[in-house]
Amino acid sequence: MDETQQFDWYLLRETDKARCFSESVHGSDSFWVPRSLITDYLKYPPKNPGELPLCMVEVPEWFAEKEGLI
């Protein structure tokens, strides 16, 4: 089994095949993660209306390294 990394990212948008996240609450520097690579996912409700929801996302370590996320 692959090693995984857990991140707290903000969800910008999602499709059937991928989710778009940002490390910033403002949505800057966004990136896509294929749903098939997300091993664990939990979306929290936004604290205030109009804010992006914060998510706990777990992905394979090799993917995080390849994308420069760690």
Locations of regions flagged by a protein language model:
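Feature detects long, helix-prone N-terminal segments enriched in hydrophobes
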Residues: 1-70
